[in-house]
Amino acid sequence: MSVFSKIFNAFKSIRLNDKNVVVGQQLDYLLVSSMYAEQQSAYLNSYETGLSKATIKKLLEEYWSVFDKETAIEILLDLQNRNEDKYINFVYDAFENKSNYVTILKSNLPAEEEIFRGYLDIYRNLNNVVPELIEENVIEDFAQIKRIKDAAWNYGRGAFLSRCCYEAGYLSESEMKEYLRKSFTNLKKYCSTWQEYTISYIFGRALWGGPNNSGMIQIADDLLHNEKSPLKNKKYL
């Protein structure tokens, strides 16, 4: 996809399928994929993404290293398991107690240098990400992030990838639906509203992808407020 096409697609909002529409509780499960789906200009209201086979193949292989059922399951499970990180709260505690952050991190994180440096990088990223999100009016304070974490970033990407894997033939329809259901159920442990879902996704994107997230913020606004959006009249997960 050319740079021009990506820019053009960024301004195309809310793509809906007029066939094979998902409704009811199943739609709620499906909408966990909505942030990533909007990034890719995919359908929001059907299991079918509306993307070409070539686009799906490129997304799976070049960006996610998914080539078959085995690698698909490996990546999808990893995205769900990332939310079970038992050390991340210590990083958040260190961020809230900056004068004592070294002691907090060294006392609670694994001693292995590579692992420790990984968490230290997260701590440093927080110092850039949190002020930016407050300035952009995405969050009011860090307390919002500490509760919802980047759960939607992980579950949301996994949910959309499961749809792509289904279309690529790596997951059965029942496997995809179960993955979407589980993603929704687990997401509710962190986010209680769809607005929190979008905030959590933006936070994850900012934490791992860097600054300049105005595009993601616009996507979230469209999902929550555009009259065509399936999320427009939904508040709670």
Residue ranges and their predicted role:
Residues 2-166, 170-237:
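Polar/charged low-complexity regulatory segments
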